[in-house]
Regions:
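C-terminal catalytic/motor cores of large multi-domain enzyme assemblies
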Residues: 1-219
Length: 219
């Protein structure tokens, strides 16, 4: 997560989104993910949503994420977005269709009430899901027509894989697969490839994340 945030700080075009057929660039970086309150089929989910900037480091991010997860797992706490959805699905079908159409109309124009979406991960710069935490490998998640999210990252389960060397030999190392889905309209392939190179550099050299995220990195 820290590596992704630093990528967005150093490569601001990754923080763009499309709304109403126009391109916008956020003035903040937000990260969101779903938190399971308990590891049980019947358990509810909470929405974690945090903002970060160039002055943050991996240490400040780690502290804030632990605090956010603790709050999300409390049974007596529910975010506004989840609470609204719970009420919405109780409406009669005909009324639900009307409300949903109105919300999509407002979303297209950037007019959805902030209280309804301030914890909605579909409005975050980075939408994360950690499938590795439930024993699954990484994959690719689609982007949604709702919201402004343009970047989805799926984290897979840690597993062993060969790392091949130039002489034909290999070393077996633990690896984690990442599935990245990006809205191709916010940039071009060259810009995306640079972002992936930077992400790889940060993952291979995590000590770089101990400095403020705004600190430049050669890659």
């Amino acid at each position: 997560m820290a590596a992704l945030v630093k990528c967005f700080v150093l490569r601001p075009r990754m923080n763009r989104f499309i709304s109403g057929n126009r391109v916008y660039e956020r003035d903040h970086i937000s990260v969101a993910f779903v938190v399971k309150k308990h590891f049980a089929d019947s358990s509810e989910e909470g929405l974690a949503y945090k903002h970060y900037g160039g002055d943050d480091t991996i240490d400040t991010l780690h502290t804030s994420i632990l605090e956010e997860i603790y709050q999300c797992r409390r049974d007596d706490v529910k975010d506004n977005s989840s609470d609204f959805m719970d009420k919405l699905v109780r409406l009669p079908h005909w009324m639900l269709k009307i409300v949903v159409n109105i919300l999509f109309f407002l979303d297209h124009r950037g007019k959805v009430p902030f209280d309804l979406i301030k914890a909605d991960p579909n409005y975050a710069s980075i939408f994360l899901t950690n499938l590795g935490s439930i024993g699954l490998q990484s994959g690719y998640h689609h982007l949604n027509n709702w919201g402004t999210n343009s970047f989805f990252c799926v984290i897979g389960k840690k597993h062993l894989a060969p790392e091949w060397h130039e002489d034909g030999s290999y070393t077996v190392r633990p690896v984690i697969g990442l599935g990245l889905t990006v809205d191709e309209r916010i940039g071009d392939g060259y810009y995306y490839s640079g972002t992936v190179r930077l992400l790889k550099k940060l993952m291979e050299n995590p000590e770089l994340l101990e400095q403020p995220f705004s600190t430049p990195v050669e890659y």
